[in-house]
């Protein structure tokens, strides 16, 4: 039994994520758990399941190894910069395109909102838990057998399936998110996480990226409730396409370097 679980460890966990979240969200709907427990608990339960799984298959060393990417901080500053500005840049591009489409001044759409310190801390904690579960474990494990890009897209499917009950409940997430748009956006999010992680092996960079995603969604008028569903969908599409562009450019650059190296050797 242990050998079977160890062999299919990451797939077992990916399947468990959306399955476990359904009764957890239902418990919130029925009022069995409070809002505060639900908000962070939905992430904590994933980490708890993962730690239990790793203890069973790998022991304490497996759990310690799970958090190792969070110790990697010595990476080129460009990756920190990309993680810092990428989400907000996509949001600004979306709003500029919106203003062009409606033929109005950009200032009519671009506005930045602030929230409480408690909310910012919550966004950071959620980003941390998400980074450990979805990136430091899922994407890293899948990348051992398949290319990081494909690993990110596979994780995006299960990540979105995990989010669907949360979206339907509409608590602890942006209200009125179209599920199809959520899928598109999560493909972009997971793809960017895989891109950053594959180049840095740094959980800190991914944590910064995900924190900025959360801040961007609440700071700029791109949510369905304050920007409209089409704005959110456009944001998700641009995020996804830009992610594809970065992966494509990276492939071409690496392929070109490989060809030049082969020519030098010949």
Regions found by a protein language model. Give the residues of each.
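Active-site-flanking alpha-helical
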Residues: 28, 133-142, 170, 208, ...
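Hydrophobic/aromatic residues in alpha-helical transmembrane segments
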Residues: 93, 138, 192-193
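Residue-level signature of the transmembrane alpha-helical core
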Residues: 18, 44, 84, 120, ...
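Membrane-interface helix/loop boundary segments of multi-pass membrane proteins
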Residues: 129-156, 198-202
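Membrane-helix boundary elements
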Residues: 149-174
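Alpha-helical transmembrane segments and their helix-entry boundary regions
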Residues: 10-14, 79-80, 137, 151-152, ...
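Functionally important transmembrane alpha-helices
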Residues: 177-232
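Specific transmembrane helices
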Residues: 2-127, 198, 218-266
């Amino acid at each position: 039994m242990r050998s079977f679980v160890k062999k299919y460890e990451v797939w077992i966990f990916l399947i468990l994520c959306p399955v476990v979240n359904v009764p957890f969200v239902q418990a919130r709907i029925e009022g069995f758990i409070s809002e505060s427990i639900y908000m962070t608990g939905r992430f904590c339960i994933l980490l708890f399941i993962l730690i239990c799984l790793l203890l069973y298959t790998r022991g304490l060393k497996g759990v310690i190894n799970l958090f190792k990417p969070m110790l990697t901080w010595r990476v080129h500053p460009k990756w920190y910069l990309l993680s810092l500005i990428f989400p907000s840049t996509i949001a600004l591009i979306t709003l500029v395109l919106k203003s062009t489409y409606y033929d109005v001044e950009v200032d009519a759409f671009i506005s930045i909102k602030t929230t409480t310190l408690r909310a910012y801390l919550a966004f950071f904690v959620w980003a941390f838990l998400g980074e450990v579960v979805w990136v430091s474990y899922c994407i890293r494990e899948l990348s051992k057998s398949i290319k990081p890009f494909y690993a990110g897209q596979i994780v995006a499917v299960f990540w979105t399936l995990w989010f669907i009950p949360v979206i339907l409940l509409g608590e602890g997430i942006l209200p009125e998110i179209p599920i199809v748009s959520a899928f598109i956006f999560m493909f972009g999010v997971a793809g960017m996480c895989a891109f950053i992680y594959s180049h840095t092996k740094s959980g800190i960079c991914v944590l910064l990226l995900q924190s900025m995603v959360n801040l961007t969604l609440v700071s700029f008028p791109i949510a369905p409730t304050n920007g409209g569903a089409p704005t959110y969908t456009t944001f998700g599409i641009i995020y996804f396409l830009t992610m594809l562009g970065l992966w494509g450019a990276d492939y071409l650059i690496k392929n070109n370097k490989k060809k030049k190296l082969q020519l030098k050797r010949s």
